[in-house]
Amino acid sequence: VTIGPVCELPKEVGGPCRGHIIPRY
């Protein structure tokens, strides 16, 4: 499940998006 716009890195790993989480495992 992708929340918000597609980001290169999720916030959990210091991504450029605020409050956006993308599953990259």
UniProtKB/Swiss-Prot annotation:
GO cellular component annotations of the record: extracellular region
Keywords (A to Z) from UniProt: Protease inhibitor, Secreted, Serine protease inhibitor
Signal peptide: none
GO MF annotation list: serine-type endopeptidase inhibitor activity
UniProt superkingdom: Eukaryota
Residues marked Reactive bond (site): C17, R18
Subcellular location: Secreted
Domain BPTI/Kunitz inhibitor: 6-25
General function of this protein: Inhibits bovine trypsin, human plasma kallikrein and human neutrophil elastase.
Protein name: Kunitz-type serine protease inhibitor 2
Organism of provenance: Rhipicephalus microplus
